[in-house]
């Protein structure tokens, strides 16, 4: 579909107030064929304060015909139209997977998406929970008569002909639980993950290029800047977005005095609501790009710093066992739900990404300062359990 053919109705996501993330009720979708006539990704974007990253759904053709959907995205008219095109060639959607128990940005789409495919079985990761009340799945919008919990053994499900999967035992964080299900597609030797692994591209993903405003907003150095739309500025904005998204507040970022922030807003050249009325409470250090390069690690597989410091290190032994089981599969490529995709990587590279569980962090300790401070606060007030000792 050409850009001229897109209308606001095509992009409509009416349930955005449930999880009010940018771009709210208007979401573009890009479909990419990864393996010819076999595997496709559907990308949208979402975030807060223009800290936006891709969110990805994977669709795979089953050997017996029909389609498998991993981690649905917002079922906008554009997205459903692209799905119908695949159905017309490869058969109807048979299975829809909710592979996470904690990612509300993934959960919110599953029920509305499933309504467009009334014959599909919806499989969900075990130990689902909701906050502030732990509600039945049907109350969360999932179809009651065709939603099933994934059993521990993939061979006991109809999925076993095409896939193996491994469920990460639920990690009790006191304030909630974390778990996800990794799927391995035998034919394409593709590993599917939700949040457990990422690879950071140097340049902005295509879905962010469709509307570069968030990239250019974060490319600014001061509130007074009017940033020209160039590839270099888009790249700078993307790399800073990555630092925000994965570190919250990297050490190369200072927050100026709020009196100065408001004073600068009065002199900003763009004061629209879109530009937050000129407010720009960020001051980047000269070596911010070095911090990005350290984080990116030349595009290798990594575990997001937030997961390294606040979540996966709570049940180290169980996480390592989960990683070891996944590493037995003959992986050739990895498709996570965020950042780069597809990633050409094997089982050994996947396993190495989790080396922080038994060794020192492979990211610079100074860059983890904010996250470790959050960790110390949560543990001190007994809001989360303390991290395990490294094995």
Which stretches of residues belong to each language-model region?
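Catalytic core of the metallo-beta-lactamase
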Residues: 2-81, 135-223, 246-254, 258, ...
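Short active-site-adjacent helix-start/loop capping segments
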Residues: 50-51, 77-80, 104-107, 131-133, ...
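Small-side-chain structural scaffolding
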Residues: 57-58, 120, 124, 128, ...
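A general structural motif
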Residues: 64-66, 90-93, 119, 187-189, ...
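Short His-Asn-centered micro-motif
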Residues: 70-73, 97-102, 106, 124-126, ...
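Cap/insert and terminal regions of metallo-dependent hydrolase folds
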Residues: 73, 85-95, 101-104, 108-116, ...
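Active-site HxH/HxHxD metal-binding segment of metal-dependent hydrolases
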Residues: 87-159
């Amino acid at each position: 579909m050409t850009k001229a053919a897109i209308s606001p109705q095509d992009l409509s996501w009416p349930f955005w107030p449930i999880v009010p993330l940018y771009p709210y009720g208007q979401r573009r979708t890009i479909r990419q064929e990864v393996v010819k006539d076999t595997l496709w990704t559907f990308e949208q974007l979402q975030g807060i304060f223009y800290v936006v990253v891709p969110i990805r759904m994977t669709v795979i053709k089953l050997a017996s015909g029909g389609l498998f959907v991993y981690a649905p995205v917002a079922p906008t008219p554009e997205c459903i139209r692209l799905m119908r095109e695949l159905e017309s060639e490869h058969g109807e959607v048979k299975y829809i997977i909710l592979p996470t128990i904690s990612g509300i940005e993934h959960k919110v789409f599953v029920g509305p998406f499933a309504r467009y495919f009334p014959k599909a079985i919806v499989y969900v990761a075990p130990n689902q929970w909701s906050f502030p009340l732990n509600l039945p799945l049907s109350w969360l919008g999932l179809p009651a008569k065709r939603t099933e919990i994934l059993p521990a053994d993939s061979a006991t499900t109809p999925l076993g002909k095409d896939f193996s999967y491994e469920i990460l035992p639920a990690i009790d964080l006191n304030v909630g639980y974390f778990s996800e299900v990794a799927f391995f597609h035998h034919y394409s030797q593709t590993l599917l993950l939700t949040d457990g692994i990422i690879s950071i591209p140097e340049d902005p993903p295509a879905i962010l290029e469709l509307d570069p405003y968030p990239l250019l907003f974060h490319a600014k150095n001061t509130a007074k800047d009017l940033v020209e739309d160039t590839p270099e500025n888009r790249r700078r904005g993307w790399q800073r977005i990555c630092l925000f998204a994965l570190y919250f507040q990297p050490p190369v970022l200072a927050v100026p005095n709020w009196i100065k922030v408001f004073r600068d807003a009065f002199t900003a050249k763009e004061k629209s609501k879109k530009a937050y009325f000129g407010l720009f409470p960020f001051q980047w250090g000269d070596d911010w790009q070095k911090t990005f390069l350290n984080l990116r690690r030349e595009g290798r597989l990594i575990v997001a710093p937030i997961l390294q410091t606040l979540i996966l290190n709570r049940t180290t032994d169980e996480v390592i066992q989960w990683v070891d089981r996944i590493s037995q599969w003959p992986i050739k490529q990895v498709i996570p739900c965020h950042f780069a995709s597809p990633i050409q990587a094997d089982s050994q590279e996947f396993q190495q990404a989790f080396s922080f569980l038994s060794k020192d962090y492979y990211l610079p300790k100074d860059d983890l300062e904010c996250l470790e401070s959050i960790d110390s606060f949560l543990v001190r007030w007994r809001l989360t359990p303390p991290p395990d000792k490294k094995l």
